[in-house]
Amino acid sequence: MVNSSVTIYTLPCLSDNYAYVIHNSVSGTAAVVDVPEAGPLVDKISELNVPVTDIFLTHHHWDHIDGLPDLQAALTGSLGQVPARVIGAKADAHRLPALDKAVSPGDRLTLCGIEGDIYDVSGHTLGHLALHLPSAKAVFTADSLMAMGCGRLFEGSAAQMWHSLQQLRALPQD
């Protein structure tokens, strides 16, 4: 997806998952959303040749976080960067890798120079977050909303998932 100075790259990972690289050409930096595995992310970051300032984790499931140690090692190793700031849910911090910044629903966050809003989209898991970047006209929902529906309810209730989907539905259509 391209919107003015922001380009979002969708990277297939594992057998049925995705990671995202958000590139801000104005700041000359990038951010990552979810890290199922490091390889595709390292390849894209290397291709872009920009520093990654932030890594946003939507929830604690292994298929969204397992690549984090390898990505951080590549950033500080072969890519010659400093470690990226790891951001995730304060309510889920005990199940996430060590966070540099814990956020809560309603917080505003800046990733690679782009302002974003944090939403609680519990249902698939408790503490599941969505990241809305209004200026990029993008929202990262992970397993709370997918092309063919919503994720399975591992921890949350149907009522929580319905509330989460209603919040996402209320976002601007573009």
Identify the function of each model-found stretch.
Residues 14-15, 27-30, 37-120, 137:
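Active-site HxH/HxHxD metal-binding segment of metal-dependent hydrolases
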Residues 22, 34, 59, 71, ...:
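Divalent metal-coordination and catalytic microenvironments
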Residues 1, 11, 22, 106-111:
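Short acidic-hydrophobic surface loop/beta-edge motif
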Residues 17, 63-66, 148, 156:
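Residues that form or flank phosphate/diphosphate-binding pockets in enzymes
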Residues 115, 125-174:
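Metallo-beta-lactamase
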Residues 4-8:
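Extreme N-terminal starter segment of soluble prokaryotic enzymes
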